[in-house]
Amino acid sequence: MLMPKRVKYRREHRGRMKGRAKGGTEVHFGEFGLQALESAWITNRQIEAARRAMTRYMRRGGKVWIRIFPSKPYTAKPLEVRMGSGKGAPEGWVAVVKPGKVMFEVGGVSEEVAREALRLASHKLPIKCKFVKREETGGEA
């Protein structure tokens, strides 16, 4: 599972998910990517499930890049506990994803294989996603 090695503070505010992603909106490492169309918290378990679905379908062929990292802790209080008496204990880790963010990239496989692998991965995630290709820009030195 993905999680930070160490953090400065154990608990964090929930925050707000406004607007579109600032960076990481283009495919850089592979040839194909999976882009978020909605904003959400994506847990480390969901990221791992999507990664497994992709690698299992590609049968160890090609390479997978994970472009999101779960660096935000979320807390939960135990069941049947009354309100109040402080914030709950850290429960897990989430990555904050905004629309436009490329979450996964795939390289070294054909477009059909990449499309199906990323489709399987998108079913493991709680948001709508779309398949994107690397933009070929000419004239770069």
Curated annotation (Swiss-Prot):
Matching Pfam families: Ribosomal_L16
Molecular-function GO term, any one: rRNA binding
Superkingdom field: Bacteria
UniProt keyword list: Ribonucleoprotein, Ribosomal protein, RNA-binding, rRNA-binding, tRNA-binding
Cellular compartments per GO CC: cytosolic large ribosomal subunit
Stored InterPro entries: Ribosomal_uL16, Ribosomal_uL16_bact-type, Ribosomal_uL16_CS, Ribosomal_uL16_dom, Ribosomal_uL16_sf
Gene3D superfamilies: Ribosomal protein L10e/L16
One Gene Ontology biological process: translation
Oligomeric form and interacting partners: Part of the 50S ribosomal subunit.
HAMAP family assigned: Ribosomal_uL16
Family label: Belongs to the universal ribosomal protein uL16 family.
Function: Binds 23S rRNA and is also seen to make contacts with the A and possibly P site tRNAs.
Database matches in PANTHER family: 50S/60S RIBOSOMAL PROTEIN L16, LARGE RIBOSOMAL SUBUNIT PROTEIN UL16M
Protein name (Swiss-Prot/TrEMBL): Large ribosomal subunit protein uL16
Species of provenance: Geobacillus kaustophilus (strain HTA426)
Lineage: Bacteria, Bacillati, Bacillota, Bacilli, Bacillales
Gene name, Swiss-Prot/TrEMBL: rplP
